[in-house]
Amino acid sequence: MDQVKIGRFIADRRKTAKLTQLQLAEKLGITDKAISKWERGLTMPDTSIMLELCDILGISVNELLSGEKISMEHNDQKNEQLLLDMAKE
């Protein structure tokens, strides 16, 4: 997984949702510093809040972990690649 790409994607989706880092952090019950670290690719969101984060940003977990919007026709291929990447880590 490319943390920098994922971070940029989170930032893009947050801005599309017209949320500041602080507003997103408040919705998730975390600090805006955590959001900043995600968006700079320094850390990843904790698995315990990924579903809520995805719901707020209007994306799937697969899209979050791939760092891009996924069309339905490429969904199965992306799922398989994500599983392979996770197995390597």
List each model region and its residues.
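DNA major-groove recognition helix of helix-turn-helix/homeodomain DNA-binding modules
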Residues: 48-63
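Short, charged recognition helix plus adjacent turn
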Residues: 67-89
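Alpha-helical transmission elements in cytosolic ATPase-linked domains
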Residues: 9, 37-40, 52
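Residues within the helices of the helix-turn-helix
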Residues: 11, 22, 51
